[in-house]
C-alpha cells in the first residue's frame, strides 16, 4: 500500500496559508507556489535510494553517498501543474519533464485528456506527478492511468499536490493503492461545484491570471 502524507513542515504550512488568502496577487501566488514545491520536493524525495561511492577530497580519499536507482521525471497535469515544476527542478535539476493535459467539464466535473508528451525512457524513471489540487481525484486518476497504459508501474509513481479533499484522496487510494500521495494541506470537503473547501480557489486561474 502506498503512503499518504500531509507535509506539516512549518515553512510549508506558513506559505500555504499565505496563498490561500484571496487578496494576494498573481506574482506572489506564483512565486510562493514555486517555493512550496521546492520544499515538497525535499519531502517527496526523502526515500530515494543511495549507494556508496569512492571519491577523493582535497584532503583524503573517502566513501560517501550518492543517489542510486531510478532517475526522476516530473509530470505536471496541465495547466496548473506547470506552476509546481520549477520549484521541483530547483532541487532535482536533472529531472526530465513530461506533460499530461487535462480539462474539467464544468457540468459533469469529469476530466478529459487532450495532450500527453512523455520522455522516451518514462518506464525507467521514478515519476513525480504534480497538480496543485486533488479535488474529486478524476484528473489524478486519469493521469495515473495514462502512465500505466504506457508501461509505467504504480509503485514508481508519487502524486504531489498543494491541497487535497478527503474525497479525492480516497478515490485515488481506492483505485491505485500503490501510488504515494503527498499534500501540503488536507481540507474539509468538496462543495457542490467540486471545489475544495476551504481550498485556495482555482489554482490555474491564480497562477496565470486568466480564466
From Swiss-Prot:
UniProt-listed GO biological process terms: UMP salvage; uracil salvage
InterPro entries named in the record: PRibTrfase_dom, PRTase-like, Upp_B, UPRTase/APRTase, Ura_phspho_trans
Reactions catalysed according to its record: UMP + diphosphate = 5-phospho-alpha-D-ribose 1-diphosphate + uracil
The entry's keywords: Allosteric enzyme, Glycosyltransferase, GTP-binding, Magnesium, Nucleotide-binding, Transferase
Function: Catalyzes the conversion of uracil and 5-phospho-alpha-D-ribose 1-diphosphate (PRPP) to UMP and diphosphate.
Co-factor(s): Mg(2+)
Activity: how regulated: Allosterically activated by GTP.
Listed Gene3D superfamilies: 3.40.50.2020
Top-level taxonomic group: Bacteria
Cross-referenced PANTHER family: ADENINE PHOSPHORIBOSYLTRANSFERASE, URACIL PHOSPHORIBOSYLTRANSFERASE, CHLOROPLASTIC
Top-level EC class as recorded in UniProt: transferase
Source organism per UniProt: Limosilactobacillus reuteri (strain DSM 20016) (Lactobacillus reuteri)
Gene Ontology MF, one: magnesium ion binding
One Pfam short name: UPRTase
Amino acids binding 5-phospho-alpha-D-ribose 1-diphosphate: 79, 104, 131-139, 202
The EC number(s) this enzyme carries: 2.4.2.9
Protein name: Uracil phosphoribosyltransferase
Family stated for the protein in its record: Belongs to the UPRTase family.
Cofactor binding, note field: Binds 1 Mg(2+) ion per subunit. The magnesium is bound as Mg-PRPP.
Pathway involvement of the protein, from the record: Pyrimidine metabolism; UMP biosynthesis via salvage pathway; UMP from uracil: step 1/1
SUPFAM superfamilies given in the database record: PRTase-like
Residues annotated to bind uracil: 196, 201-203
Amino acid at each position: 500500500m502506498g503512503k499518504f502524507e500531509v507535509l506539516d513542515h512549518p515553512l510549508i504550512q506558513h506559505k500555504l496559508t499565505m496563498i490561500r488568502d484571496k487578496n494576494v496577487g498573481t506574482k506572489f501566488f506564483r512565486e510562493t507556489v514555486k517555493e512550496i514545491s521546492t520544499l515538497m520536493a525535499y519531502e517527496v524525495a526523502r526515500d530515494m535510494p543511495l549507494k556508496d561511492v569512492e571519491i577523493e577530497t582535497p584532503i583524503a580519499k573517502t566513501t560517501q553517498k550518492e543517489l542510486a536507482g531510478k532517475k526522476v521525471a516530473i509530470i505536471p497535469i496541465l495547466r496548473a501543474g506547470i506552476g509546481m515544476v520549477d520549484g521541483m527542478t530547483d532541487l532535482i535539476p536533472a529531472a526530465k519533464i513530461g506533460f499530461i493535459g487535462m480539462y474539467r467539464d464544468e457540468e459533469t466535473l469529469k476530466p478529459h485528456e487532450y495532450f500527453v508528451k512523455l520522455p522516451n525512457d518514462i518506464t525507467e524513471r521514478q515519476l513525480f506527478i504534480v497538480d496543485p489540487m486533488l479535488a474529486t481525484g478524476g484528473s489524478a486518476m486519469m493521469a495515473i492511468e495514462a502512465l500505466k497504459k504506457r508501461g509505467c508501474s504504480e509503485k514508481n509513481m508519487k502524486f504531489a499536490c498543494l491541497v487535497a479533499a478527503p474525497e479525492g484522496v480516497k478515490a485515488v487510494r481506492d483505485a491505485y493503492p500503490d501510488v504515494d500521495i503527498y499534500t501540503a494541506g488536507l481540507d474539509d470537503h468538496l462543495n457542490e461545484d467540486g471545489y475544495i473547501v476551504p481550498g485556495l480557489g482555482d489554482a490555474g486561474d491564480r497562477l496565470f491570471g486568466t480564466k
